Amino acid sequence: MKTYLPIILLMIALPAAAHHGTGISYDLSKLVSAKGVVVKYAWSNPHSQLYFDVKDDQGNVEHWSAEMNAPTNLERAGFTRSQMLNFFKPGAEVTVYGFRSKAGAPVVVFSRAVLTDGREFKSQGGPGQIE
């Protein structure tokens, strides 16, 4: 049994570490931006999500999403659910900055967002970071 315990513990730990391997799923070498319209903000676990629509030069709409911090991390940084829902209101025009999916999907891991009125939300922020 002593031989199997380290193997069992390793098998449990590896999937947890893999889940948090942002660099595995996203190209962290290149920050991209996408300008669009907020469809929905989801205050959810394990990560909050921002859904927004982006039009290309031909007027075709592409549905994007941005993976954000977990609600518990946002709360620790001083953000509330109502603040986030108020900032990311459906219909608001937004420019989202993030690191795109290596698979080429219209998905980014979130870095920051800027609304047309100039207000900005940064993922590493705290109180006062919605400016």
Predicted regions and their residues:
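Conserved hydrophobic positions within beta-strands
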Residues: 36-38
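Short nucleic-acid-contacting surface segments enriched for D/E, G, S/T with interspersed K/R
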Residues: 77-95
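Short boundary/loop segments of OB/S1/cold-shock single-stranded nucleic-acid-binding domains
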Residues: 17-32
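OB-fold/S1-family single-stranded nucleic acid-binding modules
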Residues: 99-126
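Positively charged n-region of N-terminal signal peptides that target proteins for export
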Residues: 1-4
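N-terminal signal peptide c-region/cleavage motif recognized by signal peptidases
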Residues: 13-15
